[in-house]
A protein has these predicted regions:
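Two-component/phosphorelay signaling modules centered on CheY-like receiver
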Residues: 21-39
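Receiver (REC) domain active-site loop signature in two-component systems and cognate sites
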Residues: 65-66
Length: 131
């Protein structure tokens, strides 16, 4: 008699694109604690060139990355490529106008740094499990 093997259900992949090294290390760890898979990239270009583009189910994206394509530029590039990936923007800019603009452009959420772990968890859950 053989034992039934448990069915392994792949965990959704959340990709983090941020030029800040500390966030590139801490956010994927936090996402993994939520029970998801995570990958981090130092630039939009690195994300676009990666093998993870097609696997990504949610993108946590810094708005401003001076040495690379900006978060909104990456959002437009994904749209141009017809990639429908829910995006959670993170920004140090506390300007509500920018936040509202990003939400109007299709972002799931725009979190102002510093944000709570709970706020990020809620945004990731909303992105991966829309009502």
């Amino acid at each position: 008699m053989g034992r039934d093997q448990p069915v392994m259900i792949p965990r959704p992949l959340v990709s983090v694109v941020d030029d800040d090294e500390s966030l590139r290390e801490s956010l994927p760890d936090l996402v993994r604690e939520f029970g998801y898979s995570a990958q981090a990239f130092s630039s939009a270009e690195a994300f676009l060139a990666s093998d993870y583009l097609d696997q990504t189910r949610c993108l946590i994206l810094d708005v401003s990355m001076p040495q690379s394509m900006s978060g909104p530029d990456l959002q437009r590039e994904l749209s141009r490529r017809r990639r429908e990936i829910p995006i959670i923007f993170i920004t140090a800019q506390g300007d509500e106008t920018i936040r509202l603009h990003l939400l109007d452009q299709g972002a799931i959420e725009c979190l102002i740094k510093p944000f709570s772990d709970t706020a990020l968890l809620e945004a990731v859950r909303s992105a991966l499990h829309p009502k």
